[in-house]
Amino acid sequence: DLAAEKLQEFAGVRRRFDLIGEAGGVTVVDDYAHHPTEIAATIKAAKALDFNRVHVLFQPHRYSRVALFSDEFGSAFDEADTVTFMDVYSAGEAPVPGVTGKTFLNVVTDHGHPHAVFVPRRIDVVPHMLEVAEPGDLVITMGAGDVTAIAPQLVDELGR
């Protein structure tokens, strides 16, 4: 029947804690989480694994979502050892004045997270993560935008 045929074709869930690679003793995974509940659940699952520290590189998705859920994002990153925010991936939306990746930084630091930073320039993201991650750590690239492209770049640089 058609349902069974389609199930056979299903390739599985992509961008849910996908292992991208390991280099220099650092493991890098990629995850699509972009809503506060998904973010918290992904970080909680990562913390249950055997890593020294969990670093989240998060790219906010859509200006409207940032504005709508900004308060809920405050606690979503609580269990991460460090959080690095990129600028917003617009997904075709027009920018909203005053809403940037720094909006997330402010919400999370106001909520009490001691190790959160905003890296506004994409070119600076991989060098920043190289400074933060150490052998035995896990880095999660997270978000619904093009942050997924950073994960293999990070693995390449960690391996040099």
Language-model features and meaning:
Residues D1-T82, N106:
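Nucleotide phosphate-binding/pyrophosphate-handling subdomain across enzymes
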Residues V28-D31, A116, V139:
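Generic structural signal for residues in well-ordered beta-strands
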Residues H34, P60-Y63, V88-E93, A144-V147:
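Short glycine-rich anion-binding loops that position phosphate/pyrophosphate groups of nucleotides
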Residues A41, L68-S70, V96-P97, L130, ...:
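Short amphipathic alpha-helical segments
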Residues L57, V119-P120, M142:
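Structural motif
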Residues G74-P135:
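C-terminal helical cap/extension that packs against the catalytic core
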Residues F85, D156-R160:
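Short, flexible loop segments at boundaries between secondary-structure elements
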Residues D124-V155:
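A glycine-rich beta-strand to alpha-helix segment
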